[in-house]
Regions:
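Active-site neighborhoods and metal-handling regions in enzymes and metal-associated proteins
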Residues: 1-239
Length: 239
């Protein structure tokens, strides 16, 4: 029966596949750095989105699979496109970009506020950052995926944010932007060396706004290795 063999080959990546994902991640981080530079008061969303896409292309990307962008109230669109809306100081930005290299796709998303964040926005963002940093502790070979999901959800529960946590915090990556595994809190499968995954940690419809974190990792014998180090550095730093 070939299907289980093919599924296993898709879930556990070869060294060459990991190298392609790492390069896609590098290009995505280059693009996101430019997005952060252009997401300023008075600029349209399309300018920041276009700057990110152009920088990723200049870094070697063969395709931008998608660009999700929303500022202010538009963060609630979840997967909305960039528009001509003018961004303003104090608005939160939700922006995700999926970058393809040699057929392999890495996605990055870092939630932030233009200008100075309010105390409420800082609390909201730091909850997301804490959940993402806690997730790191469970990205090890032999760890049950459901345990990772439960511990991410526990962070949201601690702060009374469970009702804004609408879907599981991780999926696989590879030839598709999102592919197996898709763990939830009941998953019994274990992480294995060579698996490549993307965090998808989000809160939607909270009074402070809506946003999401996406960053890529390869599971190694020593734990998670970032495929998108520019984003990992920002999240680890927090506010």
């Amino acid at each position: 029966e070939p299907l289980p063999i093919m599924a296993k080959l898709r879930v556990v990546k070869s060294a060459n596949e990991i190298a392609c994902l790492a390069e896609a991640g590098r290009q995505a981080c280059a693009g996101y750095a430019k997005l952060l530079e252009y997401a300023v008061d008075g600029a349209p969303e399309t300018m920041a989105a276009g700057a990110a896409e152009g920088a990723a292309r200049m870094a070697g990307a063969e395709d931008i699979n998608f660009m999700v962008f929303g500022s202010g109230k538009r963060t609630e669109t979840v997967i909305g496109r960039a528009t001509g809306k003018i961004m303003r100081d104090g608005e939160m930005v939700m922006a995700a970009m999926a970058v393809q290299y040699q057929g392999y796709v890495a996605t990055v998303e870092y939630p932030f506020v233009i200008g100075k964040a309010s105390d409420e926005q800082k609390r909201f963002l730091n909850i997301l950052f804490e959940a993402a940093n806690i997730q790191q502790n469970y990205l090890h070979p032999g760890t049950v995926m459901g345990e990772m999901v439960r511990n991410v959800k526990a962070v949201f529960a601690k702060y009374g944010m469970t009702k804004y946590d609408l879907y599981p915090p991780m999926h696989g990556i590879g030839l598709a932007e999102a592919e197996s595994p898709y763990p939830d809190e009941n998953s019994t499968a274990e992480f294995e060396p060579g698996m490549c995954v993307n965090s998808d940690i989000s809160l939607w419809g909270a009074p402070e706004g809506s946003n999401r974190i996406e960053e890529g990792f390869v599971i190694t014998s020593g734990g998670p290795q970032s495929l998108t180090p520019g984003i990992r550095e920002l999240i680890a730093k927090g506010l």
